[in-house]
């Protein structure tokens, strides 16, 4: 099987980007080990603190954030970091050429039940003019990413990665410590009969989304004329991994409970990297009003609605918005 380095070289990734990705993945391998220790190492449960999102931090949130932050700050390749667990950007090397945004442990509430969790990341070029503590440099649309991916900590530790030349999935060989290419050039099926959404929030959605989900649930007896299955992992990284492997549609739609938070998922380190992966695999990624990768961020923790997955099903979902106008 091909090693990560060989595939990155084949895809034309520059040397410094390859070295940065390897450095980031060294941190992810340490997170994978910490996660695997669980209660044996006393890393489960919550802390007494909240992050900038107002969410109670799990112990593994904090541990994972420190691992990635320390690893990247010492690398020499990164000018600054933005993280879900940090209020502000974290300055690194003034000579660094890249900016890294990450959710250190997506789905951390799943640690208590030994379910799927993962690390999501995106990488962009650092403007030469920026100071390492300047958050404005992160306010670039997702089209400017040079790499994005996630590491899934499940029965095996897997990496989904794109540098703009297709989406590849690698599996960590824990015997030798390297990521091996196991699923090259993933292509998401254009059609699907599976959907992922937290249906308990249905009353807070726009009427068009409520109508779309109602038609899916109506199955063969409804206007779609076929049965659909609902899958929900409660971790974006797990749901998107399933979509990449066998198709589907993932939705965290506009929610009218809080106008200041029109979506739940953060643009820079959740929506953008997943959108990049999905588009490079032949899928589609939208907010409901436009392409996720074209959203111009206004602040580093900005949230957006997400409709991601098999192209034809995403288009079908969006058509309900068009019909509601």
Swiss-Prot record:
A Pfam short name: FBPase
Annotated TM spans: none
Cofactor(s) listed in the protein's UniProt record: Mg(2+)
Protein's cellular compartments: Cytoplasm
EC number: 3.1.3.11
Xref: SUPFAM superfamilies: Carbohydrate phosphatase
Alphabetically ordered keywords of this record: Carbohydrate metabolism, Cytoplasm, Hydrolase, Magnesium, Metal-binding
Family: Belongs to the FBPase class 1 family.
Co-factor remark: Binds 2 magnesium ions per subunit.
GO MF, one example: fructose 1,6-bisphosphate 1-phosphatase activity
Keyword Hydrolase: yes
Residues holding substrate: 106-109, 198, 264
GO cellular component, one term: cytoplasm
Subunit record text: Homotetramer.
Pathway(s) the chain acts in: Carbohydrate biosynthesis; gluconeogenesis
GO term, biological process aspect, one: gluconeogenesis
Residues reported to bind Mg(2+) 1: 84, 103, 105
Protein name: Fructose-1,6-bisphosphatase class 1
Residues reported in the UniProt entry to bind Mg(2+) 2: 103, 106, 270
Record-linked InterPro entries: FBPase_C_dom (IPR044015), FBPase_class-1 (IPR000146), FBPase_N (IPR033391), FBPtase (IPR028343), Fructose_bisphosphatase_AS (IPR020548)
Catalysed reaction equations from the record: beta-D-fructose 1,6-bisphosphate + H2O = beta-D-fructose 6-phosphate + phosphate
Keyword Magnesium: yes
């Amino acid at each position: 099987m091909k090693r990560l380095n060989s595939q990155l070289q084949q895809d034309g990734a520059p040397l410094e980007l390859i070295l940065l990705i390897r450095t980031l993945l060294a941190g992810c391998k340490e997170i994978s080990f910490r996660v695997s220790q669980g209660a044996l190492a006393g890393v489960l449960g919550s802390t007494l603190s909240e992050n900038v999102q107002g969410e109670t931090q799990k112990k593994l949130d904090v541990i994972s954030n420190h691992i990635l932050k320390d690893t990247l700050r010492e690398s020499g390749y990164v000018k600054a970091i933005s993280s879900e667990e940090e209020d502000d950007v974290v300055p690194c090397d003034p000579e660094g050429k890249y900016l890294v945004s990450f959710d250190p442990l997506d789905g951390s509430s799943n640690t208590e039940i030994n379910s799927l969790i993962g690390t999501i990341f995106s990488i962009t070029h650092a403007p030469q003019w920026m100071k390492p503590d300047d958050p404005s440099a992160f306010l670039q649309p997702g089209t400017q990413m040079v790499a994005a991916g996630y590491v899934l900590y499940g029965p095996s530790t897997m990496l989904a990665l794109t540098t703009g030349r297709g989406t590849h999935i690698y599996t960590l060989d824990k015997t030798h410590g390297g990521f091996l290419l196991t699923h090259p050039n993933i292509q998401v099926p254009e059609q699907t009969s599976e959907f992922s959404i937290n249906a308990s929030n249905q009353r807070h959605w726009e009427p068009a989304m409520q109508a779309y989900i109602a038609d899916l649930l109506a199955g063969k007896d409804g206007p779609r004329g076929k049965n659909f299955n609902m899958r929900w992992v409660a971790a974006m990284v797990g749901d998107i991994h399933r979509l990449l492997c066998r198709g589907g549609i993932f939705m965290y739609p506009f929610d009218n409970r809080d106008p200041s938070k029109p979506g739940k998922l953060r643009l820079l380190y959740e929506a953008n990297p997943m959108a990049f992966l999905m588009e490079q695999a032949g899928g589609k990624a939208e907010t409901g009003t436009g392409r996720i990768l074209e959203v111009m961020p206004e602040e580093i923790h900005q949230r957006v609605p997400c409709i991601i997955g098999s192209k034809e099903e995403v288009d079908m979902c969006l058509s309900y918005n068009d019909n509601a106008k």
